């Protein structure tokens, strides 16, 4: 990393990994939008997709990143020797490695909330399937405690990674995106045929799948895309869907990372546009939740 003066800053970040260690970038407590009840959400770092509308750009890279918050900088130049010497906390690590034992201890601090609300733990990302072996072992441990488990995934991985993990879950929040295979490949770098094959597999195996569809102007906010999604879901006897309207909440994160967000000037969907998508899904017999 370089300072504002263009000088190289040492970050002392070691990128070694072990099978019993995950790389995460956040643990969010008291979430009400990522499964039933009060959830503790573990965000895994690393994603194979390049969604232009991504609200968590810090999740894309699998590496630990170091960013500088200009408002906290004292301009003391101590960081030119080592970013860890920053006295004001202007430098921030995005991502950390955590062991199975440590993560188990961390989430079980919230067990009382899980039990009183019917909630539990949700694994999100990034894309949790990029660390599927760890995630599977972790959920196996939580199951021994009787904790409700869920994952949020785009399902774009070999079934051998997805299915064992999904079978440990009370809910799989399955993120659909662009429903045209060519556009999904070109825009998002997604293997849509594999995604849909995995969706059908999960349903056939009795997994509780809850599809989620972002409503993104210019990409997924269209009657055509919605109809393509419904054409997949209805034959599977899926009876609910979450619609997630586009928002600008991620824009400050792009600035923090020194990136330009191509969606910066894109407005949120109008209430009429959201209502149209909702009506299409409801006419098809789906129970609709807007916002997750």
Curated annotation (Swiss-Prot):
Amino-acid positions noted as binding S-adenosyl-L-methionine in the UniProt annotation, renumbered to this chain: 53-55, 126, 175-177, 247
Residue span(s) of domain 4Fe-4S ferredoxin-type: 62-96
Pfam families: Fer4_12, Radical_SAM
Record EC number: 1.97.1.4
Primary subcellular site in the record, as a coarse category: cytoplasm
Enzyme category, top tier: oxidoreductase
GO-annotated molecular function: 4 iron, 4 sulfur cluster binding; [formate-C-acetyltransferase]-activating enzyme activity; metal ion binding
Catalysed reactions listed for this entry: glycyl-[formate C-acetyltransferase] + reduced [flavodoxin] + S-adenosyl-L-methionine = glycin-2-yl radical-[formate C-acetyltransferase] + semiquinone [flavodoxin] + 5'-deoxyadenosine + L-methionine + H(+)
GTP-binding as UniProt keyword: no
InterPro entries for the chain: 4Fe4S_Fe-S-bd, Aldolase_TIM, BssD/PflA/YjjW, Organic_radical-activating, Organic_radical_activase, Radical_activat_CS, rSAM
Keywords: 4Fe-4S, Carbohydrate metabolism, Cytoplasm, Glucose metabolism, Iron, Iron-sulfur, Metal-binding, Oxidoreductase, S-adenosyl-L-methionine
Family: Belongs to the organic radical-activating enzymes family.
Protein name: Pyruvate formate-lyase 2-activating enzyme
Lineage summary: Bacteria, Pseudomonadati, Pseudomonadota, Gammaproteobacteria, Enterobacterales
Originating gene: pflC
């Amino acid at each position: 990393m370089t300072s504002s003066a263009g000088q190289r800053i040492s970050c002392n970040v070691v990128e070694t990994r072990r099978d019993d260690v995950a790389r995460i970038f956040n643990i969010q407590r008291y979430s009400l939008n990522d499964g039933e009840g009060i959830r503790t959400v573990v965000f895994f770092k690393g994603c194979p997709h390049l969604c232009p509308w991504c609200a968590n750009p810090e999740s894309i890279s699998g590496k630990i990143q170091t960013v500088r918050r200009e408002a906290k900088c004292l301009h003391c130049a101590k960081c030119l020797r080592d970013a860890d010497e920053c006295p004001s906390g202007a430098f921030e690590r995005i991502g950390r490695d955590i062991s199975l034992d440590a993560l188990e201890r961390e989430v079980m601090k919230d067990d009382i909330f899980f039990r009183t609300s019917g909630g539990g733990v949700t694994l999100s990302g990034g894309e949790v399937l990029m660390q599927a072996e760890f995630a599977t072992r972790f959920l196996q441990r939580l199951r021994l405690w009787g904790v409700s488990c869920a994952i949020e995934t785009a399902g774009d991985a070999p079934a051998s990674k997805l299915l064992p993990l999904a079978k440990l879950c009370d809910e799989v929040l399955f993120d659909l995106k662009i429903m045209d295979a060519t556009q999904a490949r070109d825009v998002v770098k997604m293997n849509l045929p594999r995604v849909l094959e995995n969706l059908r597999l999960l349903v056939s195996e009795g997994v509780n799948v809850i599809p989620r569809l972002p409503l993104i102007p210019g990409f997924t906010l269209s009657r055509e895309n919605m109809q393509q999604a419904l054409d997949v879901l209805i034959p599977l006897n899926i009876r609910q869907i979450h619609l997630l309207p586009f928002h600008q909440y991620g824009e400050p994160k792009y600035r923090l990372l020194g990136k330009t967000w191509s969606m910066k000037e894109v407005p949120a969907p109008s209430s009429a546009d959201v209502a149209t998508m909702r009506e299409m899904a409801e006419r098809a017999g789906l129970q609709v939740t807007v916002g997750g």
